[in-house]
Amino acid sequence: LGYQVIIPGENRLLNGLRWDSRIDPRQWQPLPTVYERAAAAGIAAVHVTQGAFRGTGLTVATMRGADFRPADSMGALAAQAATALRESDRAFVTVYHGDLDGTGHAFGVGSDAWYNQLAHVDKLAEQLAGALPSGTYMCVTADHGMVDIGAEDKFDVDEHSDLRSGLALLGGEPRARHLYARRGAAADLLAAWRETLGDRAWVLSRDDAIKEGWFGPVDAAMTSRIGDVVAAPAGSLAIVATKAEPRESALTGMHGSLTPSEQLVPALMYTAA
């Protein structure tokens, strides 16, 4: 639902990347993962990624059921994936490499650094394709796109006290904000944000965002995690909070909104002969 969402019943946010030791990831995300479903069907399920991700809250919430194979270099990613595929007649293996995303955040999409990193990703895909057992199907894709945000496009909520009136918690991220209202203030909060941002952002109530399919099918138990108001910037606007979120506010590349550059991703298919 978002990078940072409210913990129902508590006046604090859960950051999905940093997690919170007080929150059990199995309860936070109770549905069977694709790895658990694969294993239940007799298919070997393996996830290959950086060793630092082993056992994190996000990994347990989304990747549990997978045989976690740590790999801290591109060469190791390709080798671990190939080994996992050779070990079983039927296998579902995912490989995650996050450096292209990190480079985009730091330097921007289309920067020299980003294109250099993209060349490394292309080489990784080539190595994976060359190591696949016959009949193996490979899909190379991404979990999101990205847009570049200039300093002039950063709208700092910390400098607009009128937009914080009635706001209990500012969640989400600069390109996908969840606004949690104080009791009875949701309607006024929605009106204030719409008036200030105008056509620079899509600003909807929780109910309208759900009706419009922003979050796909929403289980009733998850509804309260969504902001009372949600704001998705159009164009290259970013809704930052330089005091509360200095690190996120300083990024060059961002994602999370509804623009094609953020929602459309490549899907390259290959079947080994």
Q: Which sequence ranges carry the predicted segments?
A:
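Feature captures the catalytic ectodomains and active-site-proximal regions of enzymes
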Residues: 1-273
